[in-house]
Each structure stands twice: as structure tokens, then as C-alpha cells.
């Protein structure tokens, strides 16, 4: 009974150790799940922000293109006016 009793004691202590380690691992898994959920939420927020920024960038690009076209038209108009005024002043000179 001596050896058998020792074996049961060792087995019981091993079971206790395994239960303790299992509990630690379960806590670690729960912590990892929480961290993963937080990272997922942060990723979602970042993706939504990226979508908003892309949308804003597209709007700004369209606006800048419109402004560039307006400025180009204005420059052409002013060049034509300058040319016309130069021609008028040259023909008006004696």
C-alpha cells in the first residue's frame, strides 16, 4: 500500500498542478480574446476612418479639378483681353 499510496498522492498533486495550469491557460485565453476584440474594434474604426478620408480626398480632387479648369478659362480670357487691348492700342496709335 506504500507504493500505491504514494502513486495516488503523486497523481493527485499532478492533477492539481494540471488544473492550476489549465486555469492559468484559460485566463490567458480570455485575455487574448479581449485583446483580439479590442484590436478588431480598433481595426474597424481605422477602416471607417480610411473610407471617410478617401471620400473626402475624392471630393477635394474633384473640387481642385473644377478650380483648375476655372482658372485656366480665366487665364485664357485674360490673355485674349490683353491681346485685344494690345491690338487696339497699336492700331489707335498715330
UniProtKB/Swiss-Prot annotation:
Coiled coil spans: 15-63
Keywords: Coiled coil, Plant defense
InterPro entries, sorted: LSU (IPR039282)
Summary of the knockout phenotype: Enhanced tolerance to osmotic stress. Increased susceptibility to pathogens such as P.syringae and H.arabidopsidis.
GO BP annotations listed: cellular oxidant detoxification; cellular response to sulfur starvation; chloroplast organization; defense response to bacterium; defense response to oomycetes; positive regulation of DNA-templated transcription; regulation of defense response; regulation of response to osmotic stress
Induction text: By stressful environmental conditions such as salt stress, AgNO(3), and sulfur deficiency. Induced during oxidative stress. Accumulates at the beginning of an extended night, which may indicate that it is induced by carbon starvation and in response to sugar. Induced by a combination of light and plastid signaling.
Signal peptide (UniProt feature, chain positions): none
Domain of life: Eukaryota
Membrane-traversing stretches: none
The protein's role, per its UniProt record: May be involved in defense responses monitoring. Probably implicated into osmotic stress signaling.
UniProt cross-references to PANTHER family, sorted A to Z: PROTEIN RESPONSE TO LOW SULFUR 1, PROTEIN RESPONSE TO LOW SULFUR 2-RELATED
Name of the molecule in the record: Protein RESPONSE TO LOW SULFUR 2
Originating species: Arabidopsis thaliana (Mouse-ear cress)
Amino acid at each position: 500500500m506504500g507504493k500505491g499510496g504514494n502513486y495516488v498522492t503523486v497523481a493527485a498533486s499532478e492533477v492539481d498542478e494540471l488544473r492550476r495550469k489549465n486555469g492559468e491557460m484559460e485566463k490567458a485565453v480570455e485575455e487574448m480574446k479581449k485583446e483580439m476584440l479590442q484590436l478588431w474594434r480598433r481595426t474597424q474604426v481605422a477602416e471607417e476612418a480610411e473610407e471617410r478620408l478617401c471620400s473626402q480626398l475624392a471630393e477635394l480632387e474633384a473640387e481642385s479639378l473644377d478650380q483648375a479648369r476655372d482658372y485656366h478659362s480665366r487665364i485664357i480670357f485674360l490673355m485674349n483681353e490683353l491681346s485685344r487691348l494690345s491690338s487696339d492700342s497699336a492700331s489707335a496709335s498715330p
